[in-house]
Structures are given as structure tokens and as C-alpha cells.
């Protein structure tokens, strides 16, 4: 399943909408997403599953590039 993750790069700063970044990640659940991103110390604001028509829309209208977390 593909997830869209909204995050701030610095865990210590107050979230500001203009600084929110987005990445797409393949994982089995939201818990798995948070586990994979835990080592980066991101301030994760929201994790959203992307499927069906929403996924097709993101592929056409966004820079949908799956992040590879090692």
C-alpha cells in the first residue's frame, strides 16, 4: 500500500504549513510508515493511505516518487 506522509523536517520546531513537506512511501500500515521514518527525526503531521482514484490523481497531478528507506 502507498502512503502520503506530511511532515516537517525538524522535530524541534513548531509546524508551519508553508514548511510542510510530502513524501510517498510503500508500507503495510501507518504504524509501519512511522517505524520506517523514525530514524529521520521528522515531525510527522499526517499519514494518509493513497488508493484507487486518489492514487491515479496523485500519479497524474503530483510529483509522485516513492521514497526508498534503507
UniProtKB/Swiss-Prot annotation:
Domain of life (superkingdom): Bacteria
A biological process from GO: DNA-templated transcription
Enzyme class: transferase
A single GO cellular-component term on record: DNA-directed RNA polymerase complex
Catalytic activity: RNA(n) + a ribonucleoside 5'-triphosphate = RNA(n+1) + diphosphate
GO MF annotation terms: DNA binding; DNA-directed RNA polymerase activity
Keywords assigned by UniProt, alphabetized: DNA-directed RNA polymerase, Nucleotidyltransferase, Transcription, Transferase
Known EC number: 2.7.7.6
Keyword Disulfide bond among UniProt keywords: no
Claim: Nucleotide-binding is one of the keywords in the record: no
Functional note: A non-essential component of RNA polymerase (RNAP).
Subunit structure: RNAP is composed of a core of 2 alpha, a beta and a beta' subunit. The core is associated with a delta subunit, and at least one of epsilon or omega. When a sigma factor is associated with the core the holoenzyme is formed, which can initiate transcription.
Family stated for the protein in its record: Belongs to the RNA polymerase subunit epsilon family.
Protein name: DNA-directed RNA polymerase subunit epsilon
Species for this entry: Bacillus mycoides (strain KBAB4) (Bacillus weihenstephanensis)
Gene of this entry: rpoY
Amino acid at each position: 500500500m502507498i502512503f502520503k506522509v506530511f511532515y516537517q523536517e525538524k522535530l524541534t520546531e513548531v509546524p508551519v504549513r508553508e514548511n510542510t513537506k510530502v513524501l510517498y512511501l510503500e508500507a503495510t500500515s501507518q504504524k509501519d510508515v512511522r517505524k520506517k521514518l523514525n530514524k529521520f527525526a521528522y515531525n510527522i503531521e499526517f499519514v494518509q493511505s493513497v488508493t484507487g482514484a486518489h492514487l491515479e490523481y496523485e500519479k497524474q497531478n503530483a510529483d509522485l516518487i516513492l521514497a526508498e528507506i534503507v
